[in-house]
Amino acid sequence: MKTKNSSPARNVVLAALFLALAFVLPMVTGHVPQVGNMLCPMHFPILLCGFVLGGPWGLAVGFAAPLLRSVLFGMPPMFPIAISMAFELAAYGAVSGWLYRRVKHTLPMTYATLAAAMVAGRLVWGAVRFVLAGLSGSSFPFSAFLSGALFTAVPGIIAQLVLIPLIITALQKARVVD
């Protein structure tokens, strides 16, 4: 979303903040990987990055976050998790930023944008996982897609649908963003 005090330096600082959050939030659930899989902690800062800074920044931060986190901390594992997450989160950031810049900044449109970004990201994740499985000689059945993209992540999906619009609304009221 475009802000009145938008500047290249401010955008870089905010992008770095969202990237740092994508590194740190998974550490909250790091001791129990199943909880991390359920809550999807890296998704929150990337979706917010797209909403706040726009599609190009959301795409870049979303793509970089899981790959850099894998290299620096060893989690998520690079193949196939971090690679597929890079494409998924890039789609989250790009779609949320691109759509939000083209709609009225109302609560219903925030939800519509968020839902579209979440669906697009999950579809991209499934497509990349399918391709990576084929390249490695394994399979990625539709049941695995449903389990990974939907059933396991229900708590994270609900949390995103509740928290992201609240955060965006709070940032608007504080005039941090338009």
Where are the language model's segments positioned?
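Hydrophobic transmembrane alpha-helices
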Residues: 1-52, 56-57, 92-101, 164, 168
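Hydrophobic alpha-helical transmembrane segments
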Residues: 12-17, 44, 48, 59-63, ...
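Interfacial aromatic-anchored transmembrane helix boundaries in multi-pass membrane proteins
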Residues: 24-40, 64-99, 133-135
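Membrane-embedded alpha-helical hairpins and interfacial helices in multi-pass inner-membrane proteins
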Residues: 31-36, 74-83, 103-178
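Alpha-helical transmembrane segments of multi-pass membrane proteins
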Residues: 43, 47, 86-93, 157, ...
